[in-house]
Regions:
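Catalytic active-site module of serine/aspartate enzymes centered on a nucleophile-bearing elbow/loop
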Residues: 143-181
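Acidic beta-to-alpha connecting loop that harbors the catalytic carboxylate
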Residues: 132-134, 160
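Alpha/beta-hydrolase-fold enzymes
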Residues: 8-85
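Short, proline-enriched alpha-helix->beta-strand connector loops that line the catalytic pocket
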Residues: 93, 120-126, 149-150
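Conserved alpha/beta-hydrolase "acid-adjacent" motif
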Residues: 135-141
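Short beta-strand/loop motif that positions the catalytic acidic residue
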Residues: 128-130
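Active-site nucleophile elbow and catalytic-triad environment of alpha/beta-hydrolase enzymes
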Residues: 81, 97-118
Length: 181
């Protein structure tokens, strides 16, 4: 706290909880169960499926309906495309290590628990921003962390789920401008 003037936490909870870990677990299983991975190869089918599972955690039903409601099969094609694209820029081992590292995120570890760790932030002007349709890190988790930290809380309204912080740039800009004048 003594080195930070202001803090913004955007679409992230104080710890990687059981819901978010479950998505990572399924993604890892997709890779580990790929017969190619078991032979020591890159696991293309498992990696593509892992990315599809992850994409489902980053998005929300409202956004899928708005974009592909008239042609639902295009949503499936989109997930396949994302999986194929992912293969060109990520290695299975890197993905496994990164997802396990994410699962260990817990600001309370070694600090007396989450509540105690967040109380230390009360001396810092802080803003926590949740997203109303975020399936990965539900708004209530971010709001709960903000309350424990004695921080302000704002919420992005969007049909795009967790990815809204990347898509709803006007809302993000408005929220940040109000906090970081």
């Amino acid at each position: 706290p003594e080195r930070v003037k202001k803090l913004v936490v955007l679409a992230a909870p104080a710890r990687h909880g059981p819901w978010a870990r479950a998505f990572n677990h399924l993604s890892r299983q997709a890779i580990l169960q790929d017969p190619e991975y078991q032979k020591g190869n890159p696991a293309p089918k498992g990696m593509a499926l892992a990315r599809g599972i992850a994409m489902m955690s980053y998005r929300a039903p409202e956004g899928f309906e708005a974009r592909w409601g008239a042609e639902p099969e295009l949503g499936e094609t989109y997930l396949d495309y994302q999986g194929e694209k992912f293969l060109r820029r990520f290695h299975a081992e890197s993905y496994l290590v990164l997802s396990r590292a994410m699962d260990t995120h817990d600001v309370g570890r070694g600090r007396g628990g989450v509540e105690e760790a967040l109380k230390r932030l009360r001396a810092i002007p802080s803003l926590f921003v949740g997203i109303d349709t975020d399936l990965l890190y539900p708004a209530w988790e971010v709001r709960q962390a903000a309350k424990a930290a004695g921080a302000r809380y704002r919420e992005i309204k969007s049909p795009h789920g967790h990815d809204a912080f990347l898509i709803e740039t006007d809302q993000v800009e408005e929220i940040l401008d109000a906090f970081l004048p």
